[in-house]
Amino acid sequence: MNNKPLNRIKVVMAERMVSNKELGEMLGKDTATISRWVTNTSQPTLESLIEIAKALKCDIGDLVRMDDSTILKNQD
């Protein structure tokens, strides 16, 4: 099983210098929810990912980790 994080929210937040508290305020979410997302304990819904991308001014693809094997499987 692959133990790589499923999302890159923490990375993008660090690049934008946005804290969990700040992102939570932007999205109207509890900081505990943001913490679960950035630690990959749980994953945001697609709707939440879209909101996160808007708040962080990035593409939704910047927030999602896909390795080459996943991409190749999806091309079949």
Predicted regions and their residues:
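Short, charged recognition helix plus adjacent turn
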Residues: 1, 11, 16-17, 64-76
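Conserved hydrophobic/aromatic packing and binding residues within compact polymer-binding modules
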Residues: 9, 23-24, 34-37, 63
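Short basic helix-loop element that most often maps to the first helix and adjoining turn
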Residues: 7-26
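Helix-turn-helix/winged-helix DNA-binding modules
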Residues: 15, 41-44, 55
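Recognition helix of helix-turn-helix/homeodomain-like DNA-binding domains
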Residues: 28-44
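DNA major-groove recognition helix of helix-turn-helix/homeodomain DNA-binding modules
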Residues: 47-62
